[in-house]
Design a protein with these regions (language model features):
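Short beta-strand-turn/beta-hairpin segments enriched in glycine/proline and small hydrophobics
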Residues: 1-11, 28-46, 71-72
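Short, charge-rich amphipathic interface segments used for partner binding and complex assembly
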Residues: 40, 46-61
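N-proximal short alpha-helices
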Residues: 14, 22-23, 33
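A structural signal for short beta-strand/turn segments enriched in small hydrophobics and glycine
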Residues: 20-29, 57-66
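Short histidine-centered loop motifs in beta-beta connectors
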Residues: 7-8, 12-18, 50-54
Length: 72
């Protein structure tokens, strides 16, 4: 399992995927509102989203786990 982590501090504006959804490398997972503007979190690996740990309105910091992706 791959833990997709935020590299920025901000507030989640929206989540672009659902649990159980197939994703490809570079697919958008979530959008953050940061001090420097909007930032899109993309996945580095293809797979199935097994868990989402954030939703709109959540605050995240660098290292926060956003989603768990099953690469198998």
């Amino acid at each position: 399992m791959y833990e997709l982590r935020s590299s920025n501090e901000g507030t989640v504006v929206r989540v672009e995927v659902d649990e159980g959804q197939m994703v490809a490398e570079d697919d958008e997972i979530a959008v953050l509102d940061t001090e420097s503007g909007r930032v899109v979190i993309v996945t580095d690996v293809p797979g199935v989203v097994r868990e989402l740990y954030v939703e709109a309105g959540y605050s995240v910091t660098p290292g926060t786990v956003v989603a768990l992706i099953d690469e198998s």
